[in-house]
Amino acid sequence: MWIIEAEGDILKGKSRILFPGTYIVGRNVSDDSSHIQVISKSISKRHARFTILTPSEKDYFTGGPCEFEVKDLDTKFGTKVNEKVVGQNGDSYKEKDLKIQLGKCPFTINAYWRSMCIQFDNPEMLSQWASNLNLLGIPTGLRDSDATTHFVMNRQAGSSITVGTMYAFLKKTVIIDDSYLQYLSTVKESVIEDASLMPDALECFKNIIKNNDQFPSSPEDCINSLEGFSCAMLNTSSESHHLLELLGLRISTFMSLGDIDKELISKTDFVVLNNAVYDSEKISFPEGIFCLTIEQLWKIIIERNSRELISKEIERLKYATASNSTPQKIIQPQRHIQKNIVDDLFSVKKPLPCSPKSKRVKTLENLSIMDFVQPKQMFGKEPEGYLSNQSNNGSAQNKKSGDNSEKTKNSLKSSSKKSANTGSGQGKTKVEYVSYNSVDKGNSSPFKPLELNVVGEKKANAEVDSLPSENVQESEDDKAFEENRRLRNLGSVEYIRIMSSEKSNANSRHTSKYYSGRKNFKKFQKKASQKAPLQAFLSLSEHKKTEVFDQDDTDLEPVPRLMSKVESIPAGASSDKSGKSSISKKSSNSFKELSPKTNNDEDDEFNDLKFHF
């Protein structure tokens, strides 16, 4: 703002503040907001006109004065500024000191610029006070500049000290609040005649420091208080950088979170972060690095022993890191190891899942025979009656399924004994499924391993699908259900037991030329002569050679090309919806017709053991 004063008594011995506006200077005018009276008979009644322009945005950063325009009002002796005559149209001046001589007046008027640039910490407060302060000739802004003389602190309830306030305190800027601005606007009329009535901002600053415990006692106690320490910081604010420089720190900056140089940070004593970017989940620093925000650092600075506090914290973190450090586990890449597929399939130690892509986890309590007979289909709808037991069923459902499975087991055991007795007497060919109950109930595995049961052996937990009575008539619904019930090739192994009558055992020597090369042929032949009718297990390769079953390629997809799929139940077998299969007399005759076609027309009593994948 511009202030004028003069030697002698031409201005009544007072200094006056010139706010932006127009003033008429003469000996016959009154002193008010638009006139300046000069007591001298050597000047005209209306001698000159002074005009003060409002400050510009550039003036806030330069601290330069507002334009001072002087125009002579056609006087006899004219007007001089800095010993130069003012032109007829007037002249404007940007100097900070002006010496104005009016006509033949023996005294000069001295005009000088008092710089006052106010910085705001809050944009809302800036928009509220900017226009009023500009009318007083005071430039305002948000950014720090070398010309800033006053800093308006935000004193809202619950607000903490900001980085701008810290920096303003350390560089000895006068800190004020909105109460000072209100008082400044009310004394405008009174300070026109006497500039000494201008409110003192230092008194306001002292009151703020005295009543606020977030400030140190003086800026001198904080400047260079951390000299000798080094820190790293994110280069987001110039005020933060200047603040740390005033504290005496050696600063290493990184431009962004992705540009963090851990080797550079490991050489520093601590890391300083702004609150705006502080996020422990996004920023990861090496162990033993002391990280803190600027607000936390300022709280340490307030204490008189700030150097000792920081040194102790750094030593504590380094000691904790050295004592608790454990080598990080290096994750080795998994190498592909070839496994013996046969051992994985037939080993009792490694249970097989129901299907290769199945993610269902079944407990032993929810496990039933139907789960193995009818696995979930990969494509199409599930067959009716299929039990899909999930692992998250309630205890009531588990109990109910357990009771049903017990009833099914008892019925299967009784029917199995009857079918075995009738089959051996009448010479029927019987098909049985492999028992899946070889896993103990205490086993924690959700899948049961597959196991072969030799006919004639008695096991405590054996489960065999029984053959229903021959009087059951096959209906169209049963045939449709049977077609949907048959196993699809989802990667599990299926065993079908082929038993022949004692009469057909006599002809086994004629068919030995097809199976004598098998390793287990003599073993099964020996067991069959002692305990039960002869059994044979035909592999997939032998099945292709003998052409026992017709290949149906329509049902092979999406089965892997290295495997093949055959029907789980021979033609002629019927089943009801409870999962029980039966073979009539007609089916036994048709089953014998499936023997290999040779010149001797020999029967194939051994049928096949089919491997499904």
Swiss-Prot record:
Main location: nucleus
Source species, domain of life: Eukaryota
Keyword DNA damage: yes
GO molecular function: chromatin-protein adaptor activity; damaged DNA binding; molecular adaptor activity; phosphorylation-dependent protein binding
Cellular location(s): Nucleus; Chromosome; Chromosome, Telomere
Bias kind Basic and acidic residues: ranges: 400-409
Biased composition (Polar residues): 387-399
GO process terms (BP): DNA double-strand break processing; DNA repair; double-strand break repair; double-strand break repair via homologous recombination; double-strand break repair via nonhomologous end joining; mitotic G2 DNA damage checkpoint signaling; mitotic intra-S DNA damage checkpoint signaling; telomere maintenance
Keywords carried by this UniProt record: Chromosome, DNA damage, DNA repair, Nucleus, Phosphoprotein, Telomere
Effect of mutating residue 103 to D: Strongly decreased ability to recognize and bind phosphorylated proteins
Region (Disordered), start-end ranges: 381-428, 546-613
Motif (FxF/Y motif): 611-613
Skewed-composition ranges (Low complexity): 574-592
CDD domains recorded: FHA_NBN
Gene Ontology CC terms, in alphabetical order: chromosome, telomeric repeat region; Mre11 complex; nucleus; site of double-strand break
Residues in FHA domain copies: 23-86
Primary role: Component of the MRN complex, which plays a central role in double-strand break (DSB) repair, DNA recombination, maintenance of telomere integrity and meiosis. The MRN complex is involved in the repair of DNA double-strand breaks (DSBs) via homologous recombination (HR), an error-free mechanism which primarily occurs during S and G2 phases. The complex (1) mediates the end resection of damaged DNA, which generates proper single-stranded DNA, a key initial steps in HR, and is (2) required for the recruitment of other repair factors and efficient activation of tel1/atm upon DNA damage.
Domain writeup: The FHA and BRCT domains specifically recognize and bind phosphorylated proteins.
Subunit details: Component of the MRN complex composed of two heterodimers rad32 and rad50 associated with a single nbs1. Interacts with (phosphorylated) ctp1/CtIP. Interacts (via FxF/Y motif) with tel1/atm.
Protein name: DNA repair and telomere maintenance protein nbs1
Source organism: Schizosaccharomyces pombe (strain 972 / ATCC 24843)
Gene: nbs1
